[in-house]
Amino acid sequence: MVFSSNVFLFMFLPIFLGLYYLSGQRYRNLLLLIASYIFYAWWRVDFLALFIGVTVWNYWIGLKVGAAGVRTKPAQRWLLLGVIVDLCILGYFKYANFGVDSINAAMTSMGLEPFILTHVLLPIGISFYVFESISYIIDVYRGDTPATRNLIDFAAFVAIFPHLIAGPVLRFRDLADQFNNRTHTLDKFSEGATRFMQGFIKKVFIADTLAIVADHCFALQNPTTGDAWLGALAYTAQLYFDFSGYSDMAIGLGLMMGFRFMENFKQPYISQSITEFWRRWHISLSTWLRDYLYITLGGNRGGKVATYRNLFLTMLLGGLWHGANVTYIIWGAWHGMWLAIEKAVGINTKPYSFNVIRWALTFLLVVIGWVIFRSENLHVAGRMYGAMFSFGDWQLSELNRASLTGLQVATLVVAYATLAFFGLRDFYQNREKDSGKSARADGPATEQPGTIKAVPGDAPGSLHLPGYTVGSEAQVQPAYWVADWPRYAMRALILLLFVASILKLSAQSFSPFLYFQF
């Protein structure tokens, strides 16, 4: 089941929310767990057994690690056992086909008989729920969270359906208190519903429209330079609006149930370095890789060379996490290389001013990386890169011109205009906040009457108007209700676009989120 489907919008979600708010507080986690299992089993019932098995295994390992004591040798042995089993499960389902195909290719080239292996189907969401389980037992070992004895709460954490399929990658230590003490208010529900609608619009209106353009360009056998760059830019925008749209929907659903998940995107395409990009893109994964892989490898301990090596290996393995394809490994190596170079050069990763040249170079590096990330194989990537950097015919091919519609062109323009507007706004807002902190450190700051300011805790990834965050309350000084009209107007616009998106969804074929494949 996916969020952008009629069965979820008009059957599953209304029934679940009705039962959720009619039930007592003590039964809500159990209801959430049951609903999440139904949500997952809607795809395939048989893989639900694997999902439950991984959950129970890590719950038991967590108890063993916790009983052995923080960072003790016995706890380390239990942790190692848990992580090895988790990685073996993930490795088999995600990489068995790739491994056997690679071995068979080598054996065939030597004239040997290849292995016979039935194709292994990848369970949806396995990369996310295995990583979340691993982070839990590591946190118990480190003493960052106690081992929970409540199986229902732990199982609900792993299975909670808003983030189950494609993240954000959550951590038990951040949600443990919310499972027992979360608040449910009309304002919070309204904020969540608005955030959900934002994500739905991103997915259906923008990402799905751009997907047609990207798919067509990447499928061309002889793309022109114009075709290749159009495809690269279309996919760059498609991936952001698709994945950040899913994250918005997940965060919104969480708010509707009283949970507050971490933000997953902070205007990544405004970044002026690859290091800054990874502070803004898929934040839940990048921080997971930092805390559980980079630090485990040694982090910045051991000198400069070891630091560069650990950065590179972390991103290399991060690329492999995305899938069993050499293209993902190269993509990870590409980002790892630039992270190491920026670290070695000592580039300023938190610039105070917006440097167009630095931004353009960073964006170019990101787009180049997305091309191989999107390509089915090295042949497709080579074909696209060859066309992009031949700087030959910038005209679109006849096939492309024949298929490209005015709506698709307009959507691409709107997508990048939106990225530019909110990205620059986010940059200068953050700079003003930093300046404000410096001013408060030097002396008392004064406010002019009638100042409109955002409430602390604004969601950085959400749509903003000056002084407002869609889905959040705003403080107005003085509190004239007239000053709130932009927020209500924006909510009305989002509702209108949401209804239009539902109508568009009904008219198009099924389009899953891109990160479902990972």
UniProtKB/Swiss-Prot annotation:
InterPro entries: Ac/AlaTfrase_AlgI/DltB, AlgI, MB_O-acyltransferase, MBOAT_fam. It holds the Pfam family MBOAT. Keywords: Acyltransferase, Alginate biosynthesis, Cell inner membrane, Cell membrane, Membrane, Transferase, Transmembrane, Transmembrane helix. Its EC number is 2.3.1.-. GO terms for molecular function: acyltransferase activity. Residues 435-456 are annotated as: Disordered. It is a multi-pass membrane protein. GO terms for biological process: alginic acid biosynthetic process. GO terms for cellular component: plasma membrane. It is found in: Cell inner membrane. It comes from the Bacteria. The active site is at residue 322. The chain crosses the membrane at residues 2-24, 39-61, 78-100, 115-137, 150-172, 319-341, 354-373, 402-424, 493-515. Its main location: membrane. Pathway: Glycan biosynthesis; alginate biosynthesis. Together with AlgJ and AlgF, forms an inner membrane complex which probably interacts with the alginate polymerization-transport complex and adds acetyl groups at the O-2 and O-3 positions of mannuronate residues. Acetylation of alginate is important for the architecture of biofilms and increases the ability of alginate to act as a defense barrier. Belongs to the membrane-bound acyltransferase family. This is Probable alginate O-acetylase AlgI. It comes from Pseudomonas syringae pv. tomato (strain ATCC BAA-871 / DC3000). The gene is algI.
